[in-house]
Curated annotation (Swiss-Prot):
Family: Belongs to the TrpB family.
Its EC number(s): 4.2.1.20
Pathway where this protein functions: Amino-acid biosynthesis; L-tryptophan biosynthesis; L-tryptophan from chorismate: step 5/5
One Gene Ontology term, aspect cellular component: cytoplasm
Alphabetical keyword list: Amino-acid biosynthesis, Aromatic amino acid biosynthesis, Lyase, Pyridoxal phosphate, Tryptophan biosynthesis
Enzymatic class: lyase
PROSITE patterns for this protein: TRP_SYNTHASE_BETA (PS00168)
Keyword Iron-sulfur included in the entry's annotation: no
Name of the featured protein: Tryptophan synthase beta chain
Biological process annotations from GO: L-tryptophan biosynthetic process
Length: 392
């Protein structure tokens, strides 16, 4: 068992996974400072993925919500359409350096699956993606993209047929194939060293934001807002601003149909600490410790636990965590789309929804940056099926 700097995290694993996770931790400690690895990754991110991504001021949207200055970090413009590629390219390159020939991954919204399939195609690795059956149904465009890219997509029909079940299947695969397989975990959670690995690869977001906002405004922002499922886009977005206590960090969970309905994915609102998928963090569970089913219109937020870094920042008060309902996220989706011509992912729309709710109370001179973690193309079939009255 690895020690963690706080009570959250750790590596709570069956015996068959202890050796591969210990080997990965040892190799990662070497590679994360190896200049040849870092230089190759930087080159790929710049020349293949399209970094850096823009920081866009959205004046029409700010006026529409009676808000302060609002900027979007445009991870939707990264190759494949979301922040997930930062981590997928990093981990698949890591896999090659470790001599692996096959990569397995889990996916909810499909963006991590597409990113992993893309990275594997680029780097010449075999790819298998596990995806909950209900997510396969609501994210068909991404399923087809993965298959086009050469990945095998396995529909998981166990449990609630969601992201947690896909993670279970991916871990079972890795347990028996780790000699030639790397498990490319898509969020900043799981057993150590995965939260550290994913944070490392996603922190490129906040490094760029810090440089970009200083070039525009000459200072750090007042508020950063990001959606939070597992927490990778948020921790990458927050990372370089955590040392500055004047920057307010806000994570927005999937409120689903509302807390009282019981159909949501708000871990900080109603969960309590527990062990799940090999790590200790906030978890939606019943009185007997059984993991509860979750609901969110956004597949990427539909997960019962959350990354250990976010659990620590919640308890320390360094970050504030709230929620947005499905309906609030949909309204924010259309507000941005119609005022700026930018179609956000439903995940990112939760962050926008919280900004909409607080904007009128904020001083007009403040600077708020929202991480637009992905684009909404993948969500259009689902949105089209819903009641058009919500935006007419």
């Amino acid at each position: 068992m690895f020690k963690h700097k706080h009570p959250f995290g750790g590596a709570f694993l069956p015996e068959e996974l202890l050796a591969p996770i210990q080997n990965l931790k040892a190799e990662w400690e070497i590679l994360k400072t190896q200049q040849s690895f870092l230089s190759e990754l930087d080159c790929i991110l710049k020349n293949y993925a399209g970094r850096q991504t823009p920081l866009t001021e959205v004046k029409n949207f700010a006026r529409a919500i009676d808000g302060p200055r609002v900027f979007l970090k445009r991870e939707d413009l990264l190759h494949t359409g979301a922040h997930k590629l930062n981590n997928a390219l990093g981990q698949c390159l890591l896999a090659k350096y470790l001599g692996k020939t096959r990569v397995v991954a889990e996916t909810g919204a499909g963006q991590h699956g597409v990113a992993t399939a893309t990275a594997c195609a680029y780097l010449g690795l075999d790819c298998v993606v596990y995806m909950g059956a209900k997510d396969v149904e609501r994210q068909k465009p991404n399923v087809e993209k993965m298959r086009f890219l050469g990945a095998e997509v396995v529909s998981v029909t166990k449990g609630s047929c969601g992201l947690k079940d896909a993670v279970n299947q991916a871990l079972q695969d890795w347990a028996t194939t780790h000699s030639f397989t790397h498990y490319c975990l898509g969020s900043a959670l799981g057993p150590l060293p995965y939260p550290d690995i994913v944070r490392f690869f996603q922190s490129v977001i906040s490094a760029e934001v810090k440089e970009q906002i200083h070039a525009v405004a000459g200072r750090d922002p007042d508020i950063l807002i990001a959606c939070i499922g597992g927490g990778s886009n948020a921790i990458g977005f927050f990372h370089h601003f955590i040392p500055n206590p004047k920057v307010q960090l806000i994570g927005v969970e999937g409120g689903g149909l509302g807390i009282s309905s019981g159909k949501h994915a708000a871990r900080f609102a109603t969960g309590r600490p527990g062990v799940f998928h090999g790590f200790y963090s906030y978890l939606l569970q019943d009185d007997d410790g059984q993991v509860l089913q979750t609901h969110s219109i956004s597949a990427g937020l539909d997960y019962p636990s959350v990354g250990p870094d976010h659990a620590e920042m919640h308890e320390s008060g360094r970050a504030f965590y709230t929620l947005a309902t499905d309906e609030e996220a949909l309204r924010a989706f259309f507000l941005l789309t119609r005022n700026e011509g930018i179609i956000p992912a439903l995940e990112s729309s939760h962050a926008l929804a919280h900004l909409v709710s607080i904007a009128p109370s904020l001083p007009k001179e403040q600077i708020v940056i929202v991480n637009l973690s992905g684009r909404g193309d993948k969500d259009l079939p689902q949105i089209i099926r819903r009641n058009r009255g919500i935006y007419e």
